[in-house]
C-alpha cells in the first residue's frame, strides 16, 4: 500500500504518479464527466420525446389555466384564487434552454479532458490538476443532479403531480445556481484562479484557451440560463405557497412579484460583488434577468386579464403596482449591466490586456469602414466615381498592438509621402532674411533698353546697356 517502489521498477519511472491514488482520482473524474454527458443527453431526449408524444405529457404541454370570466354585476368579496402558472411557450423555452446549456457544459468538460494532456510525459496527478481547472468534481456532481432533477420535474408534470413537481424544480434551481457559481469560481480565491490560468499560457496554450476565454463564454451562458430560470423558480415557489395558504388573486400577483424581485436582485448582487472578480465581462446574467422579467410580466398580465373583476374588486390598482415593480427590476438589471461593462472596460484599459487591444483595433477598423462608406456615398451623390480617398484609411488597421502610435495616430513605419515638393515660399523668405548675391542665378531681364542709375558698388544687372 504505502511501500515505496524499488528502484528500477516500472512504478519508479519518471512518468509514474507522484501522489498516491492520483490515477484512481483521474478515472473517477472521467466517469463523472461521462455520467454528466449521459444525463444531459437524457434530459434533452426527454424534452424531444415530450414534444413528439404530447398525449403522454398532458400537464406539461397543456395550455395555461383558463379563468372563466366573472359576472360584472356580481360583487366579489373574497375567495381563494387559483395558483398562477407560466404559459406553455415560456415554460418549455426555459426547460429547453436549461437542458441545452447543461449539454454544452458537459461537452466543455469532455473537451477539457482532452486538452488537459498538454505534454506526452504527463503523470496522472498533473493531468488531473489540469482537468480540474476545466471543471472540478463538485461542479460535475451539481451538473448531474441538476439534469436528473429537471427530468423528474418533467415526468411529475406529465403525471399531473403539480405540487411535488414545483418542489423538485425549486431544488433543481438551487442546484443550477450552485453549478453556475462553482463553475465560475472553481472553489478557489480570485487571485489563485488568475495565477493558475495565466500559468498555462506558455506550457499549455491550447488548454489555456479552454480554461480562459472559452470558460468565460460558458460562464456567461450558464449565468444567463440561471437568471432566466428565476421566472420559473418564482412561479414554483408562489405555487407551493398558494397550495398551502389561502391566497387571494391580488395577493398571488404581489407574492410572485416579490419573490421574483428578491431572486433577481440577490443574484445580480452576487454577480457584481463576487463573480466579477473571476470573469470581468459578464453580460449574460443581466440579459437573462431582463428576459425573465418579461416572462413574469406576461404571466401576470394573463392572470390579471382572466380575473380582472376579482382583482380590481379585492385590491384596486394592484396590477399597476406589479407593473411598476417589474419595470424597476428590469431597470435595475439594465443599470447593473451598464455598471458591469464600465468596470470591465476600465479594468482592461488599466491593465492593457489583450482583450482591450483587440477591442480597440476592432473599433478602429469599424471607424475606417464607416468613413469609407460615407466617402463613397458622398461621391455617388456628386455624380463622380465612389473612389477610395486617402483619408479613409486609418493607420491602426495595419499596425499591431506592439507598435508605437503617436498622438496623431501615425506609427513609426513607412513615411506617408515618398517625395516632397520644394517649397518656393520658404526659399524666398530665406533670401529676404539673408540678402546677398544669388549664386549662379539667371538674370531677370536679358534685354532691358532703358536707363538705370548705377550704385556705388557692382551693377545689379550685368547686361544693361547705357545710352
Swiss-Prot record:
The chain crosses the membrane at residues 33-53, 91-111, 138-158, 164-184, 221-241, 251-271, 281-301, 319-339. Residues 1-32, 112-137, 185-220, 272-280, 340-467 are intravirion. GO terms for cellular component: host cell endosome membrane; host cell Golgi apparatus; host cell nuclear inner membrane; membrane; viral envelope; virion membrane. It comes from the Viruses. Residues 371-395, 432-459 are annotated as: Disordered. It is a multi-pass membrane protein. Keywords: Disulfide bond, Glycoprotein, Host endosome, Host Golgi apparatus, Host membrane, Host nucleus, Membrane, Transmembrane, Transmembrane helix, Viral envelope protein, Virion. Pfam families: Herpes_glycop. Residues 54-90, 159-163, 242-250, 302-318 are virion surface. Belongs to the herpesviridae glycoprotein M family. Interacts (via N-terminus) with gN (via N-terminus). The gM-gN heterodimer forms the gCII complex. Envelope glycoprotein important for virion assembly and egress. Plays a role in the correct incorporation of gH-gL into virion membrane. Directs the glycoprotein N (gN) to the host trans-Golgi network. This is Envelope glycoprotein M. It comes from Human herpesvirus 2 (strain HG52). The lineage of its organism: Viruses, Duplodnaviria, Heunggongvirae, Peploviricota, Herviviricetes.
Amino acid at each position: 500500500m504505502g511501500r515505496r517502489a524499488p528502484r528500477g521498477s516500472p512504478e519508479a519511472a519518471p512518468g509514474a504518479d507522484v501522489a498516491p491514488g492520483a490515477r484512481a482520482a483521474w478515472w473517477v473524474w472521467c466517469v463523472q464527466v461521462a455520467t454528466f454527458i449521459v444525463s444531459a443527453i437524457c434530459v434533452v431526449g426527454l424534452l424531444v420525446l415530450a414534444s413528439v408524444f404530447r398525449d403522454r405529457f398532458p400537464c406539461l404541454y397543456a395550455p395555461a389555466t383558463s379563468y372563466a370570466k366573472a359576472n360584472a354585476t356580481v360583487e366579489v368579496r373574497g375567495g381563494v384564487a387559483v395558483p398562477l402558472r407560466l404559459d406553455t411557450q415560456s415554460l418549455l423555452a426555459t426547460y429547453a434552454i436549461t437542458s441545452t446549456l447543461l449539454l454544452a457544459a458537459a461537452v466543455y468538460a469532455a473537451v477539457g479532458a482532452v486538452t488537459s494532456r498538454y505534454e506526452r510525459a504527463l503523470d496522472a496527478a498533473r493531468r488531473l490538476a489540469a482537468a480540474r481547472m476545466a471543471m472540478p468534481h463538485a461542479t460535475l456532481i451539481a451538473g448531474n443532479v441538476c439534469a436528473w432533477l429537471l427530468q423528474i420535474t418533467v415526468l411529475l408534470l406529465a403525471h399531473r403531480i403539480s405540487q411535488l413537481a414545483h418542489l423538485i424544480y425549486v431544488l433543481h434551481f438551487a442546484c443550477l445556481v450552485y453549478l453556475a457559481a462553482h463553475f465560475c469560481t472553481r472553489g478557489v480565491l480570485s487571485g489563485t484562479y488568475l495565477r493558475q490560468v495565466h500559468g498555462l499560457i506558455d506550457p499549455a496554450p491550447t488548454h489555456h484557451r479552454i480554461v480562459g476565454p472559452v470558460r468565460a463564454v460558458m460562464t456567461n451562458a450558464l449565468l444567463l440560463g440561471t437568471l432566466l430560470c428565476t421566472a420559473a423558480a418564482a412561479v414554483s415557489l408562489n405555487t407551493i405557497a398558494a397550495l398551502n395558504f389561502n391566497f387571494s388573486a391580488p395577493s398571488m400577483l404581489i407574492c410572485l412579484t416579490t419573490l421574483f424581485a428578491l431572486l433577481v436582485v440577490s443574484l445580480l448582487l452576487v454577480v457584481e460583488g463576487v463573480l466579477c472578480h473571476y470573469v470581468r465581462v459578464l453580460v449574460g446574467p443581466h440579459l437573462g434577468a431582463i428576459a425573465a422579467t418579461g416572462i413574469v410580466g406576461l404571466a401576470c398580465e394573463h392572470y390579471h386579464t382572466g380575473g380582472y373583476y376579482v382583482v380590481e374588486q379585492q385590491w384596486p390598482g394592484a396590477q399597476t403596482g406589479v407593473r411598476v415593480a417589474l419595470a424597476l427590476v428590469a431597470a435595475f438589471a439594465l443599470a447593473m449591466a451598464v455598471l458591469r461593462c464600465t468596470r470591465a472596460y476600465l479594468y482592461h484599459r488599466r491593465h492593457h490586456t489583450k482583450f482591450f487591444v483587440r477591442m480597440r483595433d476592432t473599433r478602429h477598423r469599424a471607424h475606417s469602414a464607416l468613413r469609407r462608406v460615407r466617402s463613397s456615398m458622398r461621391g455617388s451623390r456628386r455624380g463622380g466615381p465612389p473612389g477610395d480617398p486617402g483619408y479613409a484609411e486609418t493607420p491602426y488597421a495595419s499596425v499591431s498592438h506592439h507598435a508605437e502610435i503617436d498622438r496623431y495616430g501615425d506609427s513609426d513605419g513607412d513615411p506617408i509621402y515618398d517625395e516632397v515638393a520644394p517649397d518656393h515660399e520658404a526659399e524666398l523668405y530665406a533670401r529676404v532674411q539673408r540678402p546677398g548675391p544669388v549664386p549662379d542665378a539667371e538674370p531677370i531681364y536679358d534685354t532691358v533698353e532703358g536707363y538705370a542709375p548705377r550704385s556705388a558698388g557692382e551693377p545689379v544687372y550685368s547686361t544693361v546697356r547705357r545710352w
